[in-house]
Amino acid sequence: MSTSAIIYSGYNMCKFYDGTKLLSLQDLNGQRPEIYICTTNRTGGKTTFFGKLCVKKFLNNGEKFCLLYRYNYELDGIADKFFKDIGRLFFPKYNMTSERRASGIFHELYIVENGCDNKVSCGYAITLNSADQIKKYSHLFSDVQRIMFDEFQSESCHYCPDEIKKFISVHTSIARGAGEQIRYVPVYMLSN
């Protein structure tokens, strides 16, 4: 994983936050960063922009995504939690479902066109607290192209023990495979 990160507090007068500028920036060495940190006020539109980006990249290019959380209980109702707003706003022809995998260690996300029975896997939802188990299932995540970590800053300072080590472990587990020892898998870290 690249050690560089781009931090940008984006605000514009559009209806929704636009992270296009953030994603176009390079680090001090002129390289494309692997970690993008985006902070704005609550309801600034960060989650909407990056969630829409993940789904749009899947629908247009088949690029799967990963939603990253801290604790397993946060995966309950994940499809509705992630897709309810962006689905209504940007993807009204689609619905999202999820299925627990590996005894609930992670969830596989599926996108379904309304009126169709054919669900298509579009990504995964995993947790930092399951970093050791995720490592054992890393081969399943070799098709992930991007990671979205919403609310990476806890308002109550409730973090996982060794959270940074777990974050690096999860990213490494996802960024290997697909014929590569290490792949470029950007992480969008969003918070207030």
Q: Which ranges hold each PLM region?
A:
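Phosphate/NTP-binding elements of NTP-utilizing enzymes
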Residues: S2-N192
